[in-house]
Amino acid sequence: MPFQREHSYAVYILGSISGTLYIGVTNNLKFRVSQHKDHSFGGFTAKYEVDRLLYFEIFREVTDAIKREKQLKGWRREKKIALIEKDNPQWKDLSREWFQPPLVQKFDWQL
């Protein structure tokens, strides 16, 4: 049987400091969030500085992820906020640690 790579898909909600929300879908959440953070492509998220990962869900099937993305995009803002705040009440950037440089351990002789 040939090797078959497993895929996963993420539906995510990004937010800005001012509270602007953006919903998207991707097959590589870490890479996609990094694109939003460094504004490597123009558009809505770059214009409104929407680069904080507030919420995400993982799906095995792309069709399920797209269906969920469309569902969330159809929700009123209040319902989206309730979804975020259920798991992330302080609106912390869930990707913050993904992009920080690794901690460097200092040895006694380096101090």
Label every model-predicted segment.
Residues 1-41, 46-56, 66-67, 87-89, ...:
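GIY-YIG nuclease catalytic motif and its immediate N-terminal context
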Residues 70-83:
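Short arginine-rich
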Residues 58-73:
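Mid-chain, well-packed structural core segment of small domains
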Residues 29-30, 61-63, 77:
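Residues at or immediately preceding the N-termini of alpha-helices
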